[in-house]
């Protein structure tokens, strides 16, 4: 069938900021789709609010709008651009919900915009729980016993019929937002009221829990001629009851008989045909482990996290082909880009095993609720490929960067068996490692199966890993056992531990005996057809399929799984670096392990190695490829942390030298450099023990900022006000030692400024300076950043420029550098320097049209910035005002305090741009999910030190017409200044302020931290209540003041004459 010629211009809706449940997989899908549509000759217009994506680069679409993904803003773009069609199925849940809103409001019809891909009725039939259930009943496809409710009372009526446990699934949400498993009345009430709040349709499905069934997924494609195929089927190792995004997944499924596989395949294809889906679709099924009974759980009528995984697992580009199906092409006329010879209608076959393990944020949020259920909590994931299940699992484990390298915890032997079993009984993020620990202690697989309902197949594989450990222990130095352990994915580190040797001894032994991995190709067809893809994984077999060319090569280290503090911004820089390497005529090689990202799309680099980012795995690739050098500055802390280890093997680190990287990180050397170049920093000292930290803090004077050296995202960083708080920090948050010192710095309050620069060793180019709205003390990743700076004097700007050039030259930077400054009452101080790409690089690149990562890579390869046409110093400003606003995922993480401080907590970001600061801020806040209203009620409860400042904000909000509620102390302060205020009661008393929030009487809460950081504090309860009820809560008065500016600019003040 020829493609559609009745449309020329297509609007693609992206998925917006990265949140838990909707991450980089949509950047990958959206990028593929836009390029595929352009390839077919269509004009593509993209709208997305996330600047940290490749898809929002100018080259990806004909026109790119970085605007909030709300009905009003997209409607404006439709009226301006007059597209012929809208493609909503590549923007995650956000894209689908936007399509439904634009259709329901009549905007699509009024502007003659057609929907491409799956019909709206089909989307609604799959997403609306009631319609879906009806269709399944018509098809005789079993669904769990369930009911649709719009109120909490209806949920309790259903509970009377079927009893507990129950699963709650809100309609039209993703990542299980608002849902959960309920075992009693209190949980049912909380989860259903939450779910109704988060569902755009105020609708929840309540179903009888089938927790314990196997969870199986089929990733399917269908075109308009009813050709339908299964791209990949996947099995969750965790049974039904844990969200698939939080489950350990294996592909292809390992425990299904042929009868079961074909039965579920037939059902999946039957459902996708009945729904009339055109494009990609994900079908989730539950299978009774003891019979052929099954249920269908849900269908996602769009490209999803699972389809990104299926694409990387098989090499079959689902999003690209889904976009082409949407414009009328069919599976039997499109070639599979991997083989270049077989058609897309051939189902992929795999001759390897894929393991996916989620990456959770609990290393950041140690007090967070770790137990897993139907609401997703992982921020990212890793994937590994092996010839055996054990090999792929162990490779995935060491890709996580949790400090775990194997099936066990670092100090696992110190736990009591009772504690281990108790932890296995809770479904949490560490259960896999505790199972390994239990098997080591001799716990039977039967007992483990009864506790976890994990299939015996997987438990036997875990047992096999532990058996190999014992064999290694009993055969120290035996090469046969070394080879055997390598076949099953054991790392040198783990073997060394079993043999009481050093990791480097095992590495050298392997090299001397020629025990090295070979690299196999991922080709979608189990080597049946000739394949041309440069996509490889390592394994210990005989035949190497990765042919080394004689071209000069540069190897780029990716940034691994997405986590708080290291997001898609680093993938963005990695991809741009690769493009620059290719343009310079080198062969570009990527090593990465994240299945969601653009960098692991096989069409980006000349060669892709899907491998763990560890010293051993990277060295194996370097030994084969012999690159000219390795680039570490684009892969975040993951890559930087490998630089030292690789250099010890004689590998050339390209760009800023290892000595200079270490000088930026080492406290004493850095201080010496600052003295030499006359750049001031806040007074600070290094402590290697709690006693020394107390001595330092008293000398410097409180408040002080304390943190471990070498961290990204401000991990374990705190501002402390007295000896007691410092002692708590030193004993609970960190283990200080001479190898791991703790830094104690004077805490300066003032404006925080962030600068990114590029240097070639001679010239330092500064694309722009960003001013933070929140004062120093809030992590830069959680602050609202503004370009160009709005309140700096020319002298301050000149000083920032001067210090940036001195620092870049003093550290001999080749490539990128990111610097944070604070402007205190007595001048500019440097807070920290990162000699690498940063999370603001994509934002600044978009604003200034200076492709920073590409310029940096060109400088690393020896081009000068002068040759590229750049002059030293700050570059001319772009017109307009731009803000980068953080986006948080607190609604997915229970027990996490939302107060902003030096520890980073945001998962993503949006950009707002307009002619004035207030308009840009309005877009930034709106894009981040904050509904800015010109009237309403604000609740204020602030600490004593903030009471003077809150008076000004309250006065301005009162002038606009906002009603003010406040707790007693704050209210008294406002009354003293003649500001009308209503006093609300403390928690637990009469007229409880929490009840006011829960009843929807409050639109904004302003609450600042009172010290005494324990969870019991009232402030914590207030902040969590705002999250559970979807009320914006501001914990920084700077943000509150900025918001007040925005509201003032939208409205009029009312004053009597």
From Swiss-Prot:
Its cofactor is Mg(2+); Mn(2+). Pathway: Amino-acid biosynthesis; L-arginine biosynthesis; carbamoyl phosphate from bicarbonate: step 1/1; Pyrimidine metabolism; UMP biosynthesis via de novo pathway; (S)-dihydroorotate from bicarbonate: step 1/3. It comes from the Bacteria. Residues 930-1057 form the MGS-like domain. Mn(2+) 1 binds at residues 284, 298. Mg(2+) 1 binds at residues 284, 298. Mg(2+) 2 binds at residues 298, 300. Binds 4 Mg(2+) or Mn(2+) ions per subunit. ATP 1 binds at residues 129, 169, 175-176, 208, 210, 215, 241-243, 284, 298. Mg(2+) 3 binds at residues 820, 832. It is an enzyme of class 6 (ligase). GO terms for cellular component: cytoplasm. It catalyses: hydrogencarbonate + L-glutamine + 2 ATP + H2O = carbamoyl phosphate + L-glutamate + 2 ADP + phosphate + 2 H(+). Gene3D superfamilies: 3.40.50.20, ATP-grasp fold, A domain, ATP-grasp fold, B domain, Carbamoyl-phosphate synthetase, large subunit oligomerisation domain, Methylglyoxal synthase-like domain. GO terms for molecular function: ATP binding; carbamoyl-phosphate synthase (ammonia) activity; carbamoyl-phosphate synthase (glutamine-hydrolyzing) activity; metal ion binding. Residues 133-327, 671-861 form the ATP-grasp domain. The keyword Translocase does not apply. ATP 2 binds at residues 707, 746, 748, 752, 777-780, 820, 832. Mg(2+) 4 binds at residues 832, 834. Mn(2+) 2 binds at residues 298, 300. InterPro entries: ATP-grasp, ATP_grasp_subdomain_1, CarbamoylP_synth_lsu, CarbamoylP_synth_lsu_oligo, CarbamoylP_synth_lsu_oligo_sf, CbamoylP_synth_lsu-like_ATP-bd, CbamoylP_synth_lsu_CPSase_dom, MGS-like_dom. The large subunit is composed of 2 ATP-grasp domains that are involved in binding the 2 ATP molecules needed for carbamoyl phosphate synthesis. The N-terminal ATP-grasp domain (referred to as the carboxyphosphate synthetic component) catalyzes the ATP-dependent phosphorylation of hydrogencarbonate to carboxyphosphate and the subsequent nucleophilic attack by ammonia to form a carbamate intermediate. Belongs to the CarB family. Composed of two chains; the small (or glutamine) chain promotes the hydrolysis of glutamine to ammonia, which is used by the large (or ammonia) chain to synthesize carbamoyl phosphate. Tetramer of heterodimers (alpha,beta)4. Large subunit of the glutamine-dependent carbamoyl phosphate synthetase (CPSase). CPSase catalyzes the formation of carbamoyl phosphate from the ammonia moiety of glutamine, carbonate, and phosphate donated by ATP, constituting the first step of 2 biosynthetic pathways, one leading to arginine and/or urea and the other to pyrimidine nucleotides. This is Carbamoyl phosphate synthase large chain. It comes from Staphylococcus epidermidis (strain ATCC 35984 / DSM 28319 / BCRC 17069 / CCUG 31568 / BM 3577 / RP62A). The gene is carB.
